[in-house]
Amino acid sequence: MVAVEQSEASRLGPVFDSCRANNRAALIGYLPTGYPDVPASVAAMTALVESGCDIIEVGVPYSDPGMDGPTIARATEAALRGGVRVRDTLAAVEAISIAGGRAVVMTYWNPVLRYGVDAFARDLAAAGGLGLITPDLIPDEAQQWLAASEEHRLDRIFLVAPSSTPERLAATVEASRGFVYAASTMGVTGARDAVSQAAPELVGRVKAVSDIPVGVGLGVRSRAQAAQIAQYADGVIVGSALVTALTEGLPRLRALTGELAAGVRLGMSA
């Protein structure tokens, strides 16, 4: 098991504490930087803040997105064709912070390596970012990131899945700070009609070894689904459905975010 120093308190901890005090889950929304273009993506992210999203996941578009579903893959491809850069993501984080929101970055690891791990952590913290979600990085290979996250007081959000062995899950949870990202279905992301029944079991496995908050993602697209997941998870993560809504325009994005924000407050009464 990887040895992890936890010298800093979680930056996202107060968000989950506040939500828990209000007997609800946090709404965590993902959008990629640069879709449909950089200014419009920043406007969309600030709209999420204004519409009730507790944490914004700011995506770094990447040319080989192995875990993204078709909706997000199409959006990130369009962003890359438009010339989006990692620095645009940092600017988006700063805009979210100025708007009163709380931002984390979600990125495959290669763009961070190219930027420089410590430099990225430094610049993310300077922009007001609170942490980093790293879907293709495992703690055993994250020594540079573990050190940089301590140096720059950033949360580190690793992924667990139904296929995670008990040993892998325990090591991942120990290395995480802020929350753990529970992938509620196997395979790529994307909105779906039925939320995975594996998700409650996976959250229970995390809760058995830690009190760290757990966010469940991969598939939520409705108020009822958000309410369902809010019964057992600390955070409800929505990505593809928000990207689809943005394709239809900011009013639709605001409306869906409001519906989802109501869902995380409703529980199973939705």
Swiss-Prot record:
Its EC number is 4.2.1.20. Pfam families: Trp_syntA. Pathway: Amino-acid biosynthesis; L-tryptophan biosynthesis; L-tryptophan from chorismate: step 5/5. One of its GO terms (molecular function) is tryptophan synthase activity. InterPro entries: Aldolase_TIM, RibuloseP-bd_barrel, Trp_synthase_alpha_AS, Trp_synthase_suA. GO terms for cellular component: cytosol; plasma membrane. The active site is at E57, D68. Keywords: Amino-acid biosynthesis, Aromatic amino acid biosynthesis, Lyase, Tryptophan biosynthesis. It catalyses: (1S,2R)-1-C-(indol-3-yl)glycerol 3-phosphate + L-serine = D-glyceraldehyde 3-phosphate + L-tryptophan + H2O. One of its GO terms (biological process) is L-tryptophan biosynthetic process. Tetramer of two alpha and two beta chains. Was identified as a high-confidence drug target. The alpha subunit is responsible for the aldol cleavage of indoleglycerol phosphate to indole and glyceraldehyde 3-phosphate. Belongs to the TrpA family. This is Tryptophan synthase alpha chain. The lineage of its organism: Bacteria, Bacillati, Actinomycetota, Actinomycetes, Mycobacteriales. The gene is trpA.
